[in-house]
């Protein structure tokens, strides 16, 4: 009989760590990973046919739930035409037109295969456009695994550009400067220390890779102003927030426009798709129009474009989806906070739209250093208990929960019931932490 443990044993013999992305290994929660066989709506099913209410949603793409009928139909309609041509197709034009029509400030779009590729290309474009080298990022924000973005976040190494991964040369990370999220003075200081050398500031408008941390009131607008004053570009990494917070992403949600925007996840409808986009005067610096080179054999893949286009068409034509998922997330968040207050659990909940995270900390969480104070051992205990009750959460304290349109209020009620039972089961551990 096939089992997750058996597959993991086999995988470890031929795949580093047994997984193709580190967080999937479940090491942070001291378990072996589940191997999934299928998914539908709000549910995942492992290879042993156990059912889970899924709040990972493939790390964000499945905003309409798994195996959406319209998306699958769109994919099925193009499959018989061929899987890859290495040539332009109509759907890549259609999806670019769709993005331009939905996202504020975007005039041109270039398709790639992942969020990492999108960010890597956007940074190269910013450097080519401004003819400057340095990039400011924020500690705790994740922008993919390209060398220049893998910079250690913490203490005196923040602005020194010390790599946060073996194999990243010092000079590759040396032009990456690190500021403190939600701290505008840390950004101003970097501009003062590096006058006329900063090409761009890149930020997750909502930091969703250190849990979920919203920007404080006015922070993004001030950041935009500082960039304009210093002739630097503002890059919004909307791989997670794009088409999730609103049809126009974080730019629409917060009313702040960036110069370049990167997309992934939702844009592919579950297929591997990324994109970077911006004003025409910037985007026309990309080859073959300009001298900033970027290419990809599978960029604009016809099958992936069909999936992404179908999802975006649904989101554009049914704006009520956003009100629906936000209300469900609010219902989930409010219910969870009532349980936390009832048992005086040391948990702080952050929510932006349909993104949530419960930090196992009694203190407010507004940046990376505060997020790091969370008790990961307690989160691991919470995760295990919730998983045993059929609730699939991210196997890390520092990841988001995603609510989809496929989640029902019955799903949420079951989740809250499991959460209360879990807190009761771990009450003695909670008391030790308070």
Curated annotation (Swiss-Prot):
Record pathway: Porphyrin-containing compound metabolism; protoporphyrin-IX biosynthesis; 5-aminolevulinate from L-glutamyl-tRNA(Glu): step 2/2
GO cellular component annotations of the record: cytoplasm
Residues bearing PTM N6-(pyridoxal phosphate)lysine: 265
Domain of life according to the entry: Bacteria
Subcellular location, record wording: Cytoplasm
Enzyme Commission code(s) on record: 5.4.3.8
SUPFAM superfamilies: PLP-dependent transferases (SSF53383)
Catalytic activity: (S)-4-amino-5-oxopentanoate = 5-aminolevulinate
Keywords: Cytoplasm, Isomerase, Porphyrin biosynthesis, Pyridoxal phosphate
InterPro entries documented for this protein: 4pyrrol_synth_GluAld_NH2Trfase (IPR004639), Aminotrans_3 (IPR005814), Aminotrans_3_PPA_site (IPR049704), PyrdxlP-dep_Trfase (IPR015424), PyrdxlP-dep_Trfase_major (IPR015421), PyrdxlP-dep_Trfase_small (IPR015422)
Pfam family name, one: Aminotran_3
One BP annotation, GO: protoporphyrinogen IX biosynthetic process
Cofactors (names): pyridoxal 5'-phosphate
A molecular function GO annotation: transaminase activity
Cited HAMAP family: HemL_aminotrans_3
Family membership noted in the UniProt record: Belongs to the class-III pyridoxal-phosphate-dependent aminotransferase family. HemL subfamily.
Quaternary data: Homodimer.
Protein name per the record: Glutamate-1-semialdehyde 2,1-aminomutase
Top-level taxonomy: Bacteria, Bacillati, Bacillota, Clostridia, Eubacteriales
């Amino acid at each position: 009989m096939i089992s997750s443990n058996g597959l993991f044993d086999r995988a470890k013999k031929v795949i580093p760590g047994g997984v193709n992305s580190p967080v999937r290994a479940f090491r942070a929660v001291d378990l072996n990973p589940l191997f999934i066989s299928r998914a539908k709506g709000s549910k995942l099913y492992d290879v042993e046919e156990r059912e889970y209410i899924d709040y990972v949603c493939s790390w964000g793409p499945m905003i309409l739930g798994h195996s959406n009928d319209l998306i699958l139909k769109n994919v099925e309609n193009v499959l018989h035409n061929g899987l890859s041509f290495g040539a332009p197709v109509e759907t890549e034009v259609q999806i670019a037109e769709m993005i331009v029509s939905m996202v504020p400030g975007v005039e041109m779009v270039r398709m790639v295969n992942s969020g990492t590729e999108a960010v890597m290309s956007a940074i190269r474009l910013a450097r080519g456009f401004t003819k400057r080298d340095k990039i400011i990022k924020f500690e705790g924000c994740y922008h993919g695994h390209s060398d220049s973005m893998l910079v250690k976040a913490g203490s005196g190494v923040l602005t020194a550009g010390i790599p946060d991964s073996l194999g990243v040369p010092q000079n590759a990370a040396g032009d990456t400067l690190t500021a403190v999220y939600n701290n505008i003075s840390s950004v101003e200081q970097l501009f003062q220390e590096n006058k006329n050398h900063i090409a761009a500031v890149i930020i997750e408008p909502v930091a969703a890779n250190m849990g979920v941390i919203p920007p404080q009131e006015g922070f993004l607008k001030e950041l935009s102003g500082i960039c304009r004053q210093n002739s630097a570009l503002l890059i919004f990494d909307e791989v997670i927030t794009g088409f999730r917070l609103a049809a126009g992403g974080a730019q629409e949600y917060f009313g702040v426009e960036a110069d370049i925007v990167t997309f992934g996840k939702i844009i592919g409808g579950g297929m591997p798709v990324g994109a970077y986009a911006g004003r025409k005067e910037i985007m026309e610096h990309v080859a073959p129009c300009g001298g900033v080179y970027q290419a990809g054999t599978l960029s604009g893949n016809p099958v992936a474009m069909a999936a992404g286009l179908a999802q975006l068409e649904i989101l554009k034509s049914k704006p009520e989806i956003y009100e629906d998922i936000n209300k469900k997330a609010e219902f989930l968040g409010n219910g969870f906070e009532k349980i936390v207050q009832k048992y005086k659990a040391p948990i702080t909940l952050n929510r932006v739209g349909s993104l949530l995270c419960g930090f196992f900390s009694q203190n407010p969480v507004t940046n990376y250093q505060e997020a790091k104070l969370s008790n990961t051992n307690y989160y691991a205990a919470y995760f295990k208990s919730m998983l045993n009750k059929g609730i699939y959460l991210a196997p890390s304290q520092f990841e988001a929960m995603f609510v989809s349109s496929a989640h029902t209020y019955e799903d949420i009620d079951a989740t809250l019931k499991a959460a209360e039972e879990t807190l009761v089961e771990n009450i003695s551990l909670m008391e030790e932490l308070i």
